[in-house]
Amino acid sequence: MTVLHSVDFFPSGNASVAIEPRLPQADFPEHHHDFHEIVIVEHGTGIHVFNGQPYTITGGTVCFVRDHDRHLYEHTDNLCLTNVLYRSPDRFQFLAGLNQLLPQEQDGQYPSHWRVNYSVLQQVRQLVAQMEQQEGENDLPSTASREILFMQLLLLLRKSSLQENLENSASRLNLLLAWLEDHFADEVNWDAVADQFSLSLRTLHRQLKQQTGLTPQRYLNRLRLMKARHLLRHSEASVTDIAYRCGFSDSNHFSTLFRREFNWSPRDIRQGRDGFLQ
């Protein structure tokens, strides 16, 4: 597995924060780092396989990656990211106690993926741009300023994350997208889902299309197909069983949609013909 080293990304040995844009982020094999990072998805879509678990990411997704996590990107479509790198929560010169603002593992579950709405994403961009402007400065005031901006970024993300901000339709759409990640195999009635998240059906269609480039049903189908592809690669369940487990009632229809999405049949993926190395 590829290991990314801090010496290749941080501007100096004493820099506590670095900015690494990926505009766009192409498919990238599984790797880990000797540093931590906050991945901010600007726009586009892709699959983020995090510690073996696939997540669909779109504009507004924020992912917190620790130095022992492994992850990869695949099936990217105009996916643009900004990575905010930091050496460790306890490696700041002027900040202490940052762990309290970061996601915490509970009962073996690590809430790595958060979502923020578009207006918050704009504020995030402004903070990141200010950090970028000061990257070449190594004096103490500049270091302190960058670390303060990093603290502001964490506070903004924490206050504005999906769990704490449901005041507008954009935030409710983010909640809906997170719900789909957990209920992709369920039979989805879009009228009922819109009501569940206090959105009109028209608003749901418009905002989901703006955020992902896909209609609601197309997004759900892609999500199901991504989960199915992951199971084909990493489980021994039959193609038919995987189709049913991922929300498809007809395995033939599943195979047709799968080939249309990936240009490979489910059996091709199972046999590794697409060249994916497990």
Curated annotation (Swiss-Prot):
Assigned keywords, A-Z: Activator, Cytoplasm, DNA-binding, Repeat, Rhamnose metabolism, Transcription, Transcription regulation
Localization (cell): Cytoplasm
DNA-binding region per Swiss-Prot/TrEMBL record: 191-212, 239-262
Gene Ontology BP annotations: positive regulation of DNA-templated transcription; rhamnose metabolic process
Database matches in InterPro entries: AraC-bd, AraC_XylS_family_regulators, Homeodomain-like_sf, HTH-like, HTH_AraC, HTH_AraC-typ_CS, RhaR_RhaS-like_N, RmlC-like_jellyroll
One annotated GO molecular function: sequence-specific DNA binding
HTH araC/xylS-type domain span: 174-272
Family matches, as PROSITE patterns: HTH_ARAC_FAMILY_1, HTH_ARAC_FAMILY_2
UniProt main location, coarse: cytoplasm
HAMAP family the UniProt entry points to: HTH_type_RhaS
Function statement: Activates expression of the rhaBAD and rhaT operons.
Name this polypeptide is given: HTH-type transcriptional activator RhaS
Native species: Escherichia coli O6:H1 (strain CFT073 / ATCC 700928 / UPEC)
